[in-house]
Regions:
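Catalytic cores of the polymerase beta-like nucleotidyltransferase superfamily
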Residues: 1-460
Length: 460
């Protein structure tokens, strides 16, 4: 919403005897010098039956929450809507995020309304008419000191999701939680959280923070990892060979890879970006099962394939499937199962064939794999040669398979024209001719049909 329309609404509220304040993340982001999103207004001193007609002067009004009076205002010519709400009075009536009785209360004071917020950095408001900052819980001071501090310890645990929100806020805004905040988060049960709400916070942590490792480290410290993600907890203390991983155990390496991956995905759509970050989180989940001392060195043979099962379990816990039509789960498991392939292909004793690239492209996006493998290579202390990933991607691009394997030239309809009936035999013939195509022996439909005819002749 334009600042002019915002001020006009605030003036109209004032003329009716109320006060409108910008609240929440918008004010926090402004104070941090970031571009704010999702403008929210809280209106004091006006009941809902007077507020709605006032808002209708400015555009279309949709009711989002009847019981606690939240209105979405869509003004003609404005790209974004604005949420306008009465201050809320909440009382806990049961477990979970739905176990609340919430009522709009226009008589609530600004301080009491801010008290229901989770952290002090989100309890700051601004008057759009005077630009006065209203900050009853010293959120600005905490922003300046990069502190994450709970507003009201007595009610913070009413919604256990706030524990995960704390981790993602720490990551996004580079905050350090106070000792009181950490102790409080450890004490709050998390078993009432549905996977969808957990994933919502994890996605923000992974995709919106420059250094997601900050939030993941806090999640470990406050017991989130232990209680929600045992697959990740198993990485803590899992040793690695110091020559290849001087940074420490698998957990430390994973945090470094997560940050490296985050630095390489700003040009990706949401689905592939989420797959890249989840791949970073999951890529070495097979190491706890496979790590052993072999010939005096710490090794993890087969950890790529061994990581698929725990990665699947973790994705199940988060209920991650597809995002915006992109199969995130398939992409993540492909990255886990094949994350060493770029380096292995480059170091192979004999040159890796074009067919090997084409076959690998059936299982995973090779551009995403190369991008991730580079993050994995750089996710260590020390200096390592990571040029194999560039070589790998150049080969994939030269073959035109960086995002997918080539489509089959010969289809079932072609075989029907040759008199082959649908069934297992047709499937076997299609597989054999496609294998030849992957190996570069077939480049056109005609060449493919000639190969099929030879196969049919050899059967007689």
């Amino acid at each position: 919403m334009s600042s002019r329309n915002l001020v006009s609404i605030a003036q109209a509220v004032r003329d009716e005897g109320g006060r409108a304040l910008i609240v929440g993340g918008w004010v926090r982001d402004e104070l941090l010098g970031r571009t704010p999103k999702d403008l929210d207004l809280e209106v004091f001193g006006l009941p809902a039956d007077r507020l709605r007609p006032l808002l209708e002067r400015f555009g279309r009004v949709e009711t989002v929450g009847e019981s606690f009076a939240v209105f979405k205002v869509i003004v003609d010519g404005d790209q974004d809507a604005i949420d306008v709400a009465l201050p809320r009075r909440e009382s806990k009536a049961g477990r979970g995020h739905k176990g609340f009785i919430v009522e709009g209360d226009p008589a609530l004071s600004v301080e009491d309304a801010a008290r229901r917020r989770d952290f002090t950095i989100n309890a700051i408001s601004r008057d759009p008419l005077t630009n006065e900052i209203v900050d009853p819980f010293d959120g600005r001071r905490d922003l300046q000191g990069r502190r994450l501090r709970v507003v009201d310890p007595r009610t913070f645990g009413d919604d256990s999701l706030r524990v995960l929100r704390g981790a993602q806020f720490a990551a996004r805004f580079d905050l350090t939680a106070t000792d009181e905040t950490k102790a409080l988060c450890r004490s709050i049960p998390l078993d009432d959280l549905p996977p969808e709400r957990i994933w919502g916070e994890v996605e923000k942590l992974l995709l919106q923070a420059e250094r997601p490792s900050i939030g993941l480290a806090l999640a470990l410290e406050i017991g989130v990892v232990d209680r929600l993600w045992p697959e990740l907890r198993a990485l803590v203390g899992c040793p690695q060979e110091p020559e290849w991983h001087p940074e420490g155990d698998v957990w430390v390496h994973t945090l470094m890879v997560v940050d490296q991956a985050r630095a390489r995905l700003d040009d990706l759509p949401r689905g592939p970006a989420a797959a890249m970050m989840l791949g970073a989180l999951c890529h070495d989940l097979g190491k706890p099962e496979t790590t052993a001392v072999i010939d005096g060195r710490i090794r993890s043979p087969g950890h790529e394939e061994a990581g698929v099962a725990p990665a699947t379990r973790l994705l199940d816990r988060l209920n991650v499937q597809s995002l915006d039509g992109y199969d995130v789960r398939r992409a993540v498991l492909g990255l886990v199962a094949h994350h060493l392939k770029p380096s292995a292909f480059k170091k192979a004793a004999t040159p890796v064939s074009d067919g090997a690239f084409r076959r690998l492209a059936q299982k995973v996006d090779l551009e995403l794999l190369a991008r991730f493998a580079k993050a994995d290579c750089h996710g260590r202390t020390g200096t390592f040669d990571c040029s194999a990933m560039d070589w790998f991607l150049d080969r994939a691009r030269a073959l035109g398979v960086e995002h997918a394997a080539p489509a089959p030239l010969v289809m079932g309809r072609h075989l029907i024209e040759l008199g082959v009936r649908p069934g297992p035999r047709m499937g076997e013939l299609l597989k054999r001719v496609y294998d030849k195509q992957l190996d570069g022996e077939i480049r056109t439909v005609d060449e493919g049909l000639s190969a099929v005819k030879q196969m049919l002749e050899s059967e007689t």
